[in-house]
């Protein structure tokens, strides 16, 4: 079954890097960690969360911009975070003591972010200062690392109460997108102690979907920007947010495995070894590959010619 024509495929050469849930591939020269099934499921699940949180933030920003008499001096920091009863998007300031003062707030059901609506500040469920502290530290560090100010924070509350903050590159141009330039941070529940800062890509690179001088469409590019042996949640989430990119192939030549990501959240594993080829479907279950040969990049074999 043909999935779609490959009009836009971004191909990333990966660098070496190890993380939990990844197993070392066979072979004396193999040093890159290959994600196992559990890790691929984790990537997909977290990518879906990033997608949902970003959509909630986008709808909140849209609602904010149609408000009358906006006081932008009171909108220094912004973030969207879930609570049991919905998404909360807040815009406000953070003082030197780390106290967050919201200026504008919005709320939407967890399962319907498009219903984002203004919320009176006195109806906010508690203090959001811990989240604001973590977001501020993360955003400042990301700007310092990648020298680009158009960024978006995504907050995930861990089971133990720790705050994980992803900072992703943003775009306002419907024909230009940015991959890389992302960092994952983890903080104590009060947002004051940074436990982890993991740089997910070495740099930022832009992808333009504008036709070329002779009308040719974007077909793909090769970059060396990924530090891990398999796909990351930020990569899959970016593709889900911007389906115009059509597909993203993540590959590490040492592992001889390619991961073909699509906007529906699927991850297809391509390998020389037939027993390794499989597909993590959008519903989180594994199955056989389901696309025709011409609809996918060939599995890597030795030196990959991109």
Name these PLM-found stretches:
Residues 173-177:
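Short consensus segments that form the blades of beta-propeller domains
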Residues 2-9:
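Sec-dependent signal peptide recognition
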Residues 27-160, 205-306:
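Active-site-proximal loop/helix of nucleotide/amide-processing enzymes and allied scaffolds
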């Amino acid at each position: 079954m043909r999935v779609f024509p490959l009009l836009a495929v971004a191909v990333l050469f990966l660098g070496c890097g190890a993380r939990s849930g990844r197993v070392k591939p066979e072979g004396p020269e193999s040093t890159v960690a290959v994600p196992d099934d559990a890790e691929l499921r984790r990537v997909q699940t977290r990518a879906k969360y990033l997608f949902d949180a970003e959509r909630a933030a986008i709808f909140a920003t849209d609602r904010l911009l149609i408000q009358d008499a906006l006081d932008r001096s009171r909108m220094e920091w912004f973030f969207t975070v879930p609570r049991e009863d919905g998404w909360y998007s807040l815009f406000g300031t953070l003082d030197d003591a780390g106290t967050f003062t919201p200026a504008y707030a919005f709320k939407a059901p967890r399962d319907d972010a498009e219903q984002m609506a203004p919320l009176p500040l006195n109806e906010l469920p508690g203090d959001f200062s811990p989240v604001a502290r973590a977001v501020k530290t993360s955003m400042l560090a990301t700007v310092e690392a990648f020298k680009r100010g158009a960024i978006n924070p995504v907050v995930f509350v861990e089971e133990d109460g720790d705050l994980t903050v992803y900072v992703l590159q943003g775009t306002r141009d419907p024909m230009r997108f940015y991959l890389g330039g992302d960092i994952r941070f983890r903080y104590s529940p009060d947002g004051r102690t940074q436990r982890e800062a993991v740089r997910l890509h070495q740099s930022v690179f832009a992808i333009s979907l504008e036709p070329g001088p002779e009308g040719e469409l974007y077909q793909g590019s090769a970059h060396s920007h990924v530090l891990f042996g398999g796909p990351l949640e930020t990569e899959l989430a970016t593709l889900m947010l911007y389906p115009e990119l059509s597909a993203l192939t993540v590959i590490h030549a040492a592992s001889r495995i390619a991961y073909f990501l699509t906007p529906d959240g699927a991850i297809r594993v391509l390998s020389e070894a037939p027993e390794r080829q499989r597909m993590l479907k959008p519903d989180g279950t594994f199955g056989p590959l389901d696309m025709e040969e011409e609809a996918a990049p060939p599995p890597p074999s030795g030196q990959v010619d991109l």
